[in-house]
Structures are given as C-alpha cells and as structure tokens.
Amino acid sequence: MAETVLLIGTRKGLWIGRSADDRKSWSIEGPQLPMEEVAAVGVDPRGGGNRTDGAQPGHDGVTPRLFAGSTNFAYGTRVLHSDDLGHSWQGVPEDAIRFPERTGNSLNRVWQITPGIQPGEVWAGVEPSAVFRSTDGGVTFTMNDALWDHPHRETWEPGFGGQAVHTVLPHPDDPEDALIAMSTGGCYRTTDGGRSWAPRSTGIRADFNPEGKKYPEFGQCVHKVARDAADPDLLFAQNHGGVFRTKDGGAHWDSIEPGLPATFGFPVLTDPRKPGTVLVFPLVADVERFPPDGAMKVWRSPDSGDTWEPLTAGLPQDGMYSAVMRDAACVDAGDPTGIYFGTRSGTVYASRDGGDSFTEVAANLPDVLSVRAATLG
C-alpha cells in the first residue's frame, strides 16, 4: 500500500504529515525548524545522498530527497535537505546559495525548490528575483547570471510579498528549456539552458496599469504557473487579476476566467493523471481577499479552462475567510491523484480522489506557506 509524506511549511516552522494506508489516515509531526519561516518545500523523487552504490545525488534514488527553504530572522536564509523522509535535516554550507558580491544583494527568501531533468539538477527561485541551479542534488547552487543581468530588471517591482521568482518549471523533455514567473515581472522563458531569457507574458492582464497599457509584454503580477501533464506547451497562470492559458509555451495567453466566481487567487494546479485538468482557489479582491461568500471551494476544470465546477465535499461552506497562498497547494503522484492545500489559518486539507472530496488532516498550525507531497511505492 502506498505511503505518502506531506511537507507543510509554515510561518513558524515545518510540520510533516505521514500516511501509510493510501492516504486514508494521517499522523502529523512537528514542529521542526521552529520559528523559521519555511516559504518553500520541495521533493526530488530521484533521491539523493541515501545511495550506497557510488551514484551521485539525483540518480534514481530509492528514497526521495526532501528540501526546505527557511528563513530565520536572526541568522538568515538557508536550504536544507533530508534523505530519510524528514526524520532529520542537513543544512547546505553557508555560502552554498548566496548572491555573488558583484550584485550587492543578499538572499531574503527561497520561494521555490524544484528538481530538473538532468542528473543532480535542482532549481531554486529566490527573493530578490533570481534563479539558482544546483548540479549536485541541491547541496550547492550557482546563480544564473543572464537573468540577474536582464535589461528588464530595473522595471521589476515588488509585490506585497516581495520581488521574487516564485515559479520555476523545467521542461519535462528538453534540458535547455525552462519557464519562470515572478511578482512583479511576469513570465520569462529560456530555450538555451539559461544563457538568455525572453518575456512570455503577452495576453496576461495588468489591471494596475493605466488604460491602453493593461496588456504589456512584461511586468505583470503573475501569482503562479502550472504545466499540463501531457502537453508541455500548455500552461496555466493564476494572475493578480484573471486566470490565463497558453497553448504555445507562453508566447500568447488567453483568459479562461469565465465561469469562476472571482478572478483573484494565488495557487494553480494541474492533475498529473488527467491532462487538461486544472484547479484554482479564487478569492474576492483586491480589498477583501476572502473566499467568495465565506465558502471554501476549489474550482476544477476538466477541459483546460473552458468550463469550471466547484469542489466542496468536506470543505467548510460557512464562515470561512482564510486564503490559500501561492505554494500552499500541491498534487501527489498517487492513483487517483491526491490534492493538498493549507490555509493562512493553519488548516490543511487532503483529497485522495482528485478533488471529489476532502478531509481535514491538520489544524491550528501557523499560517501555511508551502505544501509538497512525496509518494512512496
């Protein structure tokens, strides 16, 4: 029977959920990293340092390597990894993910940790907006110079959460190709292994711009982007205002918000077992930022955003005013797909049937910032 490990990063530490019965019941452990803000958690299913056969990190490991990007407001920001499913954590060297002196900047937060497709490759999106890449399984990282030196940099402005790269999506088949998203700045894509980056936000709305300039080439406040399971050129973006779809890898985007109760939100997910299935978490905005009508509903589209349906089974439908942050939702590799999300009021919900029903697996935690699941067996 499949086991699942759920990483739950919060404003004040890391909690770990464990299920040994195909996600029917859960135990919650923590806090780990107490009083550290864990804005990013990640899973590399290829494994890491647990190998004993001489293979390097990232080479088809038996146990997934888990990651946490944490910020201690006294000691700074760091990346940790675990090769025993979160029972213990190892910090990388202090200078393993640091800005070069020439930038005049220091690392504020790690917002995204995700594996690439090359052996040992791990990507990190950080604040201020930059991308770091590791080739040794996430032990050491190197800043991408081309993005840091991009001529658009002086136009990128901080959103409410800071000026950061929060999404890194390596292409599943092409090691030279990756798409990133930042707030604010929009989406950028490299097709030459990071030697150059081109804006890929045409068609995404920037409501905060004056009339006549609401559809710029770059500069949008994109909140999150997800890639389709079957078509790598099909991506979905939850924007500061609106939900958008591209069928050409980001060259052009179209609105898919008709049918949703609100256009604001933070996360967007795709189902790895159902191509064309996308999920969002709408909020009324810009002033309130509450779930519409005080009811927690996940909205799912089975047809790439052409139509939408609310998912409510097991979720509170009255007096619910807590938001789901951009990285506080994820899917797993189970069958059927598991869907997980945590709220700013510290409650975590899980579905083991692709979103048809949810159960509460944790409550009364600090506000949840990041969630990732590792499936075993």
Locate the predicted segments by residue.
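Extracellular glycan-interacting surfaces
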Residues: 1-377
